[in-house]
């Protein structure tokens, strides 16, 4: 098995994630090379930008099916989580990877400013390895205008004008 792969989607800050992983003592690399990605030990799918741009890049690189059929752990961050779903309202509607059968929706904030930028709490009521040594109601930094609604795959919830999934899991797909 290979190492931890940070999947290059052509729209994320990969070097900060790479630095954080290496600081924890793990080896990783940034790539979009299909032969390397499919042999990864773990994948991190980061993303900043639009679902349309990320999906176009992943399709062009022939990575969509590799991601769908990947059986080792895969962690999506922000846009990376959103493209695990089957559809995004962003960019007038985008078909996404479809591992998690829910749609990504525009955040309705009840007059709070968009995008949602800043520190906010995540609340979880399920024990999960992802939350090891993280107290419930810990604060994380958010920058987004689209959300995954609370659903059967939700592990934690955050509120910004409405509740939304801040962490989801389906099988080996985490965010």
From Swiss-Prot:
EC nos: 4.3.2.10, 3.5.1.2
PROSITE patterns linked to this entry: GATASE_TYPE_1 (PS51273)
Residue ranges annotated for the Glutamine amidotransferase type-1 domain, each copy included: 3-175
Active site residues of this protein: 78
Primary localization: cytoplasm
Record keywords: Amino-acid biosynthesis, Cytoplasm, Glutamine amidotransferase, Histidine biosynthesis, Hydrolase, Lyase
Reaction equations catalysed: 5-[(5-phospho-1-deoxy-D-ribulos-1-ylimino)methylamino]-1-(5-phospho-beta-D-ribosyl)imidazole-4-carboxamide + L-glutamine = D-erythro-1-(imidazol-4-yl)glycerol 3-phosphate + 5-amino-1-(5-phospho-beta-D-ribosyl)imidazole-4-carboxamide + L-glutamate + H(+); L-glutamine + H2O = L-glutamate + NH4(+)
Localization per Swiss-Prot or TrEMBL: Cytoplasm
Keyword Manganese (UniProt): no
Cellular component, GO annotation: cytoplasm
Pfam families linked to this entry: GATase
Transmembrane portions of the chain: none
GO annotation terms (biological process): L-histidine biosynthetic process
One Gene Ontology molecular-function label: lyase activity
Domain of life: Bacteria
PANTHER family noted in UniProt: IMIDAZOLE GLYCEROL PHOSPHATE SYNTHASE SUBUNIT HISH (PTHR42701:SF1)
Assembly notes: Heterodimer of HisH and HisF.
Function: IGPS catalyzes the conversion of PRFAR and glutamine to IGP, AICAR and glutamate. The HisH subunit catalyzes the hydrolysis of glutamine to glutamate and ammonia as part of the synthesis of IGP and AICAR. The resulting ammonia molecule is channeled to the active site of HisF.
Protein name (record): Imidazole glycerol phosphate synthase subunit HisH
